[in-house]
Amino acid sequence: MKLWRLTRAPFVALDGKGAELFGARYAPPGHPVVSLASEAGLAVLVALRYQPPDLAGIPDDFVLGWTESDVTPERVPDPDEATIRACVGEWLESRRSLLAAIRSRVLPEADVIYLNPRHPDATRVPPLTTRPFSFAECLHTPPMLASFKGMT
């Protein structure tokens, strides 16, 4: 399976250091974990939620990256946020699987995929292949927008 990540270039390593220091949405600080997405579009949507609404001051060193793994992710139950957090914390501690899949709240048809860098198989995951990514280019106003405004 292809796994996607939109991040700044200095943070492409799949080591989970950022989450270890600051936590992740479903993981407390102190646990390294790498947040990935099952779809490139989900990686963009999730990253966009953390940017200023007017996109002012966004660094210009973002990259869209992907890696691949043949491992089937363990499905995390998701009846509520507390359950997800508890399950992810236990999953990270146990190191029983490399990947965990959490249904995305942003796009429920896709999954946030957590990679546990402390799992023994983490060293087998190839580093990200990346390309430059620009929010400004991605979200520019399309030239035909004016044509559609009168169609509502």
Residue map of PLM features:
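Active-site and NAD+-binding cores of ADP-ribose-processing enzymes
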Residues: K2-D15, A27-P28, A56-T152
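Extended catalytic/binding region for NAD+/ADP-ribose chemistry, centered on the ART fold
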Residues: A27-Y50, I113-R118
